[in-house]
């Protein structure tokens, strides 16, 4: 039987998203939200490497001691790109799955991709991972924190997609040669279906492949 899995994300909203997803698969999660909202999370991501490592390591150690956790599911793109989870995994002995693991496998399959992320920290981490895996890949990206804030407020997906002009953004990416649009923020599957109905650009969501890597 799988031991409880550390579920870490930037805010309570996206942390609960993956808690619910794992529960549907019969996996117990240990709730570990880093920040109370997206603005605080962005501030955390631009803090020093030492500060970020200390916070995450402490949460890992606490979950290990209380629940015997051996794995962590990091459900936040920008957090994954701004924290050295490989080093923390080595220090704590926790096996870590992040969206970046999926991107490493994804990159060689494409020549041109578009990425939408929560902020520039997230976009930079995704870009670095994709290009290390496929240096010939052409990338275009956008950081759209206002969309994350709208999701946190509970705005309806169809209204959100329209108000933030996401179909126009997707169509611009397509016109520039993008083969697919990568959802580079774990909040964004919230509007995936609504946007899919408004664009012909294929939309990539790393969540399902992350579950496979976790062994679910």
Language-model segments: which ranges?
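Non-catalytic structural scaffold of enzyme domains
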Residues: 1-216
